[in-house]
Amino acid sequence: MAIILTNLYRTVAAGIVLALVLLAAVIVLGEVDIGSAFGGRITWAYLFVWIHVASGVMWIGLLYYFNFVQMIQMPKIPAEQKPAVSKFIAPEVLWWFRWAAMSTIVTGLIVAWLRGYLHDAYMLGFADGFDVPTFFIGVGMWLGTIMWFNVWFVIWPNQKKALNINNAYPDLPQAQKDRAARLAMLFSRTNMMLSIPLLLAMTGGGLNYGNSGL
């Protein structure tokens, strides 16, 4: 077991294997026809839901790490120790953070398209008369889209400046770095705020859609 758990990638691979074993058990014990189980839109939607949820957990988890841990603790770290965070930890976290956001939004749109509610959800359930589940999931989709935009077009570009990631801004004045850091912080806090109604909307909307048999 140690040979698996001491390596991140082997640990992830083991988790995927366990998930596939669980799926196989459901197919066998539930006497599910394999042909129907691995064909059609519903199966593809389920696969992308799985990826969507995993990506979302990483995205929101790292968002909460930034807001609940790093932002609060950075002022307490001695100046000579801060480069350990700003030069090594933060750039790596930001890589996973922004690509988890991208994976979440892309797979979410694919799921909405496969399950047939992409247009109606972005119309907030008003396309053919008001529909509560579609409104719920639509609010979540709009909030997620706004948060994704903030990550890619505000937080990430400004963090690159503030931390001089990949030495992209070696001559940027400190005043501009400070402004970039503050802007990134404010939009990270904005995403933190939006994530709370987002999670309510997504879980509520998902339960409604699950009950409708879509």
Feature map (PLM): residue ranges:
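Polytopic transmembrane helical bundles with strong interfacial aromatic enrichment
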Residues: M1-L214
